[in-house]
From Swiss-Prot:
Modified residues (Phosphoserine): S34, S316, S383, S392
Protein name from the UniProt record: Cysteine protease ATG4B
Any single Gene Ontology cellular-component annotation: mitochondrion
Compartment(s) where it occurs, according to its Swiss-Prot or TrEMBL record: Cytoplasm; Cytoplasm, Cytosol; Cytoplasmic vesicle, Autophagosome; Endoplasmic reticulum
Annotated EC: 3.4.22.-
Enzyme class (EC, first level): hydrolase
Activity regulation (record text): Inhibited by N-ethylmaleimide. Redox-regulated during autophagy since reducing conditions activate ATG4A whereas an oxidizing environment such as the presence of H(2)O(2) inhibits its activity. The cysteine protease activity compounds is inhibited by styrylquinoline compounds 4-28 and LV-320.
């Protein structure tokens, strides 16, 4: 439990275990590396992911609520990380790399702004926690992978700069026809009146200089999140190889999930170990200067990432993929179909062209779900919460 509530001030990065000397390839979000010849490239790739951890001394959530998420916000932070990776792929590309003390493009700061711990950032801990209240989750209550996915989907509607099509595949089924219809739709931003004013936009996820347009496009970039349960109390070994292959796909956003007492953002694997970013470090909240300069070093993991055995993974997870173009989606579909040919491996989800007749829940496609929709969906996945324990403050 102590390891789950480390503070940034006392954290010794030298204590983190380095990668093992192995001939096994290292897979990080669709990229393959050799530990012998590409160690620096591996660490650079890991350091370039946005790392969101517990924070303290941020503005009170809701004005009178918590000023720290230590002990309860780890799944929310993991949701931020997987969604931030989607925005990085959307605006910077998968091959973009962060370098300490090197000037980054404006789009990078625009993405980072969207996740700062302030009420007017689109995907802030404040927005996620308060949106969760509307879905029956009190502030400080544990979120399972499905719950945080549902909340992020609702928040994405307001992010017209990114213009993402967010689809959450329920019942372990991905329906290609529904996704194509969603991504080809040119829907106006629901709740546009709630967007920040021009004077506010330079300090949040919809900043000055970010191009926002209503011009129609053939395909809105897809964020596909698939909540899954890969066993009762432990992960079924028959899913392990399929899970590994998800990290090999170029469209991979990783996996959110974890083990009892903690949630993690899994970004790859080596051998029989998963590689993950751990949110269980408490850092001071970042304060913006008058010029809105963001001290960003604490948002990047500059030490070897954590690892855990695949068998330790709690079976409740959400797998994420990003398809910027329709060609990306078609390629992803072909790769998923090939997974069925893995000997001795079970598919984690089903890919179908049209919705099966036994699935009648059309509401999951709505960009703006009402509370009854989400409550119905969460009842199906309530079991995901029971296997996690809430960390004490």
């Amino acid at each position: 439990m102590d390891a789950a509530t480390l503070t940034y001030d006392t954290l010794r990065f030298a204590e983190f275990e380095d990668f093992p000397e192995t001939s096994e390839p290292v897979w990080i979000l669709g990229r393959k590396y050799s530990i012998f010849t590409e160690k620096d490239e591996i660490l650079s790739d890991v350091a370039s992911r946005l790392w969101f951890t517990y924070r303290r001394n941020f503005p009170a959530i809701g004005g009178t609520g918590p000023t720290s998420d230590t002990g309860w916000g780890c799944m929310l932070r993991c949701g931020q990380m997987i969604f931030a990776q989607a925005l990085v792929c959307r605006h910077l590309g998968r091959d973009w790399r962060w370098t300490q003390r090197k000037r980054q493009p404006d789009s990078y700061f625009n993405v980072l702004n969207a996740f700062l711990d302030r009420k007017d950032s689109y995907y802030s801990i404040h927005q996620i926690a308060q949106m969760g209240v509307g879905e029956g989750k009190s502030i400080g209550q544990w979120y399972g992978p499905n719950t945080v996915a549902q909340v992020l989907k609702k928040l994405a509607v307001f992010d017209t700069w990114s213009s993402l099509a967010v689809h959450i595949a329920m019942d372990n089924t991905v329906v290609m026809e529904e996704i194509r219809r969603l991504c080809r739709a040119n829907l106006p931003c629901a709740g546009a009146a709630a967007l920040p004013t021009d004077s506010e936009r330079h300090c949040n996820g919809f900043p000055a200089g970010a191009e926002v347009t209503n011009r129609p496009s053939a395909w809105r970039p897809l964020v596909l999140l698939i909540p899954l349960r890969l066993g009762l109390t432990d992960i079924n070994e028959a899913y392990v190889e399929t899970l590994k292959h998800c990290f090999m796909m170029p469209q991979s956003l990783g996996v959110i999930g974890g083990k009892p007492n903690s949630a993690h953002y899994f970004i790859g694997y080596v051998g029989e170990e998963l590689i993950y970013l751990d949110p269980h470090t408490t850092q001071p909240a970042v304060e913006l200067t008058d010029s809105c300069f963001i001290p960003d070093e604490s948002f990047h993991c500059q030490h070897p990432p954590s690892r855990m055995g695949i068998g330790e993974l709690d079976p409740s997870i959400a797998v994420g993929f990003f398809c910027k173009t329709e060609e990306d989606f078609n390629d992803w579909c072909q790769q998923v179909k090939k997974l069925s040919q893995l000997g001795g491996a079970l598919p984690m989800f089903e890919l179908v062209e049209q919705q099966p007749s036994h699935l009648a829940c059309q509401d999951v496609l709505n960009l703006s779900l009402d509370s009854s929709d989400v409550e119905r969906l969460e009842r199906f996945f309530d079991s995901e919460d029971e296997d996690f324990e809430i960390l004490s403050l």
